[in-house]
């Protein structure tokens, strides 16, 4: 055949584009695939599973709004890792189309015990298995593949089967090779594996061709006969065409005698179809569908049926080439191998076997047994009786043309058929309109013709009445439904591109479904329905093919309970039908032996015997219920209660079958038949001999067939039981697996929920702890600030308290000083008075001793030299004091003490006294100038020393110079107290002063005392704590009645006095006026030295004490020498530098800044008020002396005038100080301590 005949030449263009290029019935021997090429990269199942990544994100191409309704964020697991659902297991166990057809036709599998006829086994056995071919297939197990002892064990279904093994395309959309084709909806699908071919990629090239499936019997000849002749190997030279329905019409006459119609059938116009199972579907569904789709032609149903017998007589339904959006090659192959054998065949065999003149041949017996066994297997939806036809209808049928709508409808449902070589089979569905069947071969003998006639009569008598009932019921239904039902029953469906196609009639939909174009996922609806539903759901609800003729309810009208009840009743009637068939066969076989022995005269009495089942006919008013319309069995008839077949002929109202009331056309037909049978009698008598020889063999084969039928029935019952058990086990297993999966999912969900709750609780706990910690830190910070504020407040209160205490103490000190000054003033006045009195007495005594003055002049000269020596020592002592930065104010003149001079001094003249005074003034001036120079030099040395020693703040605290000097003074005072218990009284009485000098000294003495009391009183309080009152009392002593006082520098006088006394004792001479002048010089030198000490100790005033106290409070974390730092700060003039030094050494704190500020203010006040008290003291002294109305000498005036002048450096005697600070010749101010023993 040419390539043009292999492609679809009808149907929509898009459907022809999806065609794989082969025939609907079966693919060509070698697939022609010019449009596809192999993928560059091909992967196996394990490789694809290894490539699966669970965490893959959704591609950006699918995030468009267009895909949001169908987009799933989480990727699906590979199906190999997912267990079967109940629906998948059922679908994989049997093809959905095949299962539906089997349920509709009440048939299981063929009697061979293999696969369902037409279902390919193995991989790559059919084309269209690849993706993108627009075809779909399901894995199918044959009915007898259950676990029984007769057939092969059931094949267990696993996910390990590849898509190619399963042929499952339900979850995929067909992809196109063109770039603009619709892509699949699964985003995780690998595009390289999307377009695969229908054959295995691992097969060799010679294995890729078309492979014919095995039949149940495994006989190659059966396989060959099950195929249409145009696709056989020996039909290469045949040519033919396809009619409008897609059926193949051969242009040459068939060579097989068995596949030609009987010429006598044409003569009597009674043509029972060999494919009667297709025509007489369970309840005449094709006829009913034809009536529904064409109500006008349903009025002439009798003519249509007779004409259908002409056109359909041997056509297998798969030859219809109709277009549909989705092709199913499985169904194509399935229907290609199915050959329908109607119950007419069995009835013909029975009638033929009853004929005495035609003994059955072995092949005919086998045919009868096979037909019986085949009828016993139609359990799913099954029609058991053939479609009725009356003789009148068969006579009128040649006068009418067949209805083109009825022809395909009558073969719309495929039925598994028995492969028998003796049954006439045509390869086409129906002949072209107007074509006559091919004439029979001339070698066909009359015996075969008579047998066919007998079979036709038996079929007519058995089924005539039942089919009349069906026709009457359908006509009534048609009248009730009205002409509008045709449009309401039309179908719409959505093609893979999402476009709605339709409307189409039931006939067209049934043809496309039968050809395998519709998958179970196809969305369709009728005109009367509102929504689209998948084809699989409609199958479940209706329990049959929705395109069949019986009136279908609206989608959703059938409830599950009613459906299950219908299925149970259907199964019951199937079992009853099996039993009825077995009884019928037994009766026929029993009568067969008697027919061969009876003479021709008894032929009419024997004819009713095979018609014995007619006793079970029901009244005409019986209506078949809608639940069992597909059974063609009366509801009120119990097949189990059928009476056993009598051995004698059963007689009804008439004496024979010819007495039945029939129409005139029927009586004419029977007369012709009787005439023909008379002619046959002679021929059968000639063949009695041959039949007698075959009789024994026939009986033996009959018994064998009975046994086989019984065994087949038992086997099928066992298979059914095993299948049910297996299904129940699978169902239980699925339920358990589903329950486990649900439990696991529930546990997983609970676990995830617990984890989520735990995570949320931890998060809340962490937030709470964080909040608590933050609150605690805030409270801690507030408490710290509160403590700091309280500490500052406490410190401020303490400072305020200290300040108030200092002010109070200062006031008390001022009062005490004032009282002390007043007391000292009184004491000084008393001392002056006593001194004046004593001076008067001494003056008188001096007058008496004037004569002795001349004698003691020499001694006086010697004393003067000693006094000069003491003065030098005093100057050395002043140098040492200057090193300690001790200065005495120039106004302090209290250190001057009045030394009683000798009586001989009074004898001096006034000129001498004046000369002595001038000389003393000149010496004082020189000493002052020398002292100033030394002070300047000492200051320069101290400045250089301070510059040379950096980091004085970190040096260890040096011992205060005042403290060491105090210790020395205390030691000296102790020695003086031991040596001179009464220093005032031990003085020599013969020493007297001249009158004038005495008055001068006495007048100046109160001034000095008053000034000293005010100065040293303040020193008592302002010096460091070493200067206690006890030490002062022991050092400074107290004034006696005579006016002599033990002062700080009285030791020099004490040393001089004993020496003078010793010299006086040795020389027994009185003191001269020169000794008086020396004494006055010594007093002045001591006064200067005291001024130095007063200047040094003045640093320990209130300001210094405040500085040290405040710095001790601040300097808690610093190792700082406070006195040294205070003395250093006092020398810093710039306030900014003071602030920088304080912040550098005490820290940049508010306390340090406050201290620097107060330090600058207090120092400014102290400097401004430093000079005024000294001047006030000097003026107070002068006023006090004036109040006493004492004459002021020139010396007092000169001393008062020199107070404002800068004093000269006074050298201190090392013997008085106890140490020497003489600088070495090489280095300045680097001396060594010298003790008193060194002199």
Swiss-Prot record:
Residues 241-252, 888-900 have a biased composition (Polar residues). Residues 105-184, 206-409, 678-749, 763-812, 843-960, 1057-1085 are annotated as: Disordered. Residues 488-536 form the GYF domain. Pfam families: GYF. InterPro entries: GRB10-interact_GYF, GYF, GYF-like_dom_sf. CDD domains: GYF (cd00072). Residues 231-240 have a biased composition (Acidic residues). It comes from the Eukaryota. Transmembrane segments: none annotated. Residues 863-885, 901-913, 934-948, 1060-1077 have a biased composition (Low complexity). SMART domains: GYF. GO terms for cellular component: cytosol; membrane; perikaryon; proximal dendrite; vesicle. One of its GO terms (biological process) is insulin-like growth factor receptor signaling pathway. Residues 153-181, 257-272, 318-331, 678-737, 843-862, 914-933 have a biased composition (Basic and acidic residues). Component of the 4EHP-GYF2 complex. Key component of the 4EHP-GYF2 complex, a multiprotein complex that acts as a repressor of translation initiation. In association with EIF4E2, assists ribosome-associated quality control (RQC) by sequestering the mRNA cap, blocking ribosome initiation and decreasing the translational load on problematic messages. Belongs to the GIGYF family. This is GRB10-interacting GYF protein 2. The lineage of its organism: Eukaryota, Metazoa, Chordata, Craniata, Vertebrata.
